[in-house]
Amino acid sequence: MATENTPVRIGVLTSGGDAQGMNAAVRAVVRTALRLGAQPYAVMEGWAGAVAGGEGIRPLNWDSVGSILHRGGTIIGTARSKEFRTREGMLSAAANLLEHGIDRLVVIGGDGSLTGTNEFRKAWPSLLAELVETGRITPEVAAAHAQLMIAGLVGSIDNDLVGTDMTIGADSALHRIMEAIDSLSSTAASHQRTFVIEVMGRHCGYLALMSAVAGGCDYVFVPELPPADGWEEDMCNKLQAGRAAGRRDSLVIVAEGAQDREGNRITASDVCDVLEERLGEDARVTILGHVQRGGRPSAYDRWMSTLLGYAAAQEVLRATPESEPHIIGVRHNRIAHLPLMESVENTRAVASYVKAGDYEAAVEARGASFAQMLQIFENMSTPPVQGSHNEASPVKNKRVAILHAGGLAPGMNTAARAAVRLGIDHGLTMLGIEGGFPGLLDGAVKELSWADVEGWVGEGGAALGTHRDYPTIEQLYSIGRALESNHIDGLIVIGGFNAYLGAHTLIKERDRYPAFNIPIVCVPASIDNNLPGSELSIGADTAVNSTVSTLDAIKLSASASKRCFVAEVMGRRCGYLTLMSGLAAGAEKVYLPEHDANLNEIASATSDMVNSFRDGRRLYLVLRNEAACGLYSTKLLADIFAQESNGLYDVRESVIGHVQQGGNPTAFDRLMATRLVTNAMQVLVDELVAGTARGHYVGLVNGEFRDSPLAHMNDELDLVNRRPRDQWWLRLEHVIPVVSQDEVAIDKSKLPPL
């Protein structure tokens, strides 16, 4: 039993279905609790461990959760416990928790697990009274632990909890689905075949809808918006139109909870039968099943779950008996504290909306981005032969060109595809400029049709090409002539810092060159994530995932011996890639250009490293941004660490390099590209309709689309360092020493909440 002299004891458990990223959350809860002076315990196998007691409840130390970030599932096990739902089961769980002095819990699970936890919390006083009455605990123990304090984290690949943007595991599940769709699309195209793919999600259509958009699919069934009567004919017509427009394959996504408006299930087999009967299609069914729960967690499900676990440990340790229970969720990449039962009730209301036929309310409950993606999917997947409604468009036949500039970013092809198809949907004639601004100078301009961008949605690289050069003063006249000779009425520039500088130059020189008086819209695409007006850029998520995959391999290579690895990460003078990769890979130390380290700080870090190896550490991972630490290069840092090791450990360096720009874009980057271009295209069309010619740059800030004037771009920028003045992610830097460096002292009183 706990006494006044023992530390506060908290339990952590995972319950219900497993989800990738649970281990990252468990690790963060345990290590944050230890850093705050508490003693964490693992409740093994979900609530079954609490009911069973004994080895089902185990104390954890720092090393108990080492080297688990990259692992799928949950190392402490999970289960759905029938016994816990009974009064006797709850009595056993309470008695076993109190045997270890635990009256604070962090529970990671779905809405059912969180509801059961809240019922347990509400029953706690009566459970204690009964335990005292039966002599299983003393009155003193009951008085010392009069209330149960809880914090919930949503672990669910379905992403079905209303109020949080993402749940633990949803992004990783999307990774698995996209891997399957990308693989199936190549074999489907080879045979001109149709695939019907069933994805998980229960009664939530998030996975189905987002994978349909990110995978460039033809048709999708989601539970929130059952298809109207006659859906069979509508689907067949759309697939036929896609083939007529140049598609070699057809992909249909079916959510496992899909149904018609009478409440009858629509299965993948039902859809397959319709296609074979009505179109004579050689349709194949692929049910992805539990592969969506498996595999390594994505980078997002590592770094965001780490932040959630960090915040949950703080929340439950701050809680008082009067505190209302909260779910720690995510809104706009920020930690959000949501009333537990209100969130659960709002989630369960979605099913009642669907049952009542109020589909608008069901879609609205899923959030604004869900409704927007439904419309985007309809526009993007509908070939122009079905888009005759645009014959009367006020911008019909206006010529809009797409241009990439700056460094390559995965997702550029996705963005270009979206621009072409959405532009055609608006009635525009879409042009592609090959090779960036130099390509415009050379006249490398061609018209792009709906079919020309088929297959671009998941392709890495840039089919139109990109170039870092942007117009010099001497080239402006030729740029103007190129715009005029190609009759370009508007320009969408997709790229990085140099893309923005080039567009800004055209805006500034309008008085001298009338040809520049066209609407210009910049869309952020850079692995550096250093662009104004947007918290995230296209390509950054893919780059973080590529970096983390490489770091996972590096860590495995170092696990056989005591070793420090110093890895150099790209990003120029912006540390986003370094910090997020450090959080996701479990780096012990990161060096960012925003906070250049001096010799004293490097000496202190070296001393901490030596002490940690003396205490038994086997691996120490240091990440250095390519522009951080001034003259202290990656090699020099490695040499310093090696010199001070005195044979205790060895040191290796690794420059990760351009692998960070490569690979196919992640689902996140595909969706980001599609959303940003949708809004950019609307801004440009509004300019054309109004007859104005302003310059804009678009982005997402606090989850909302933002459109800013290009003429004032420099107000947001630190031009010397080529990055925004305010960078939201820097507020996360303090989390790394809390969850990765037990040898470094921290001031608990100054540990900021997220």
Predicted features, each with a name:
Residues 19-29, 50-51, 85-91, 111-118, ...:
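Short glycine/serine/threonine-rich phosphate/pyrophosphate-binding segments
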Residues 15-18, 43-49, 80-81, 110-112, ...:
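Short, ordered loop/turn segments at secondary-structure junctions
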Residues 267-394, 636-754:
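C-terminal non-catalytic interaction/assembly regions of soluble proteins
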Residues 2-3, 50-103, 114, 140-142, ...:
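Glycine-rich oxoanion-binding loops at beta->alpha junctions
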Residues 2-54, 394-441:
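N-terminal phosphate-binding or glycine-rich loops at protein starts, especially the Walker A/P-loop
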Residues 40, 107-109, 115-149, 167-285, ...:
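Accessory alpha-helical/coil subdomains and C-terminal extensions
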Residues 9-17, 74-79, 103-109, 152, ...:
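Short glycine-rich or small-residue beta-strand-to-loop segments that form or flank ligand, phosphate
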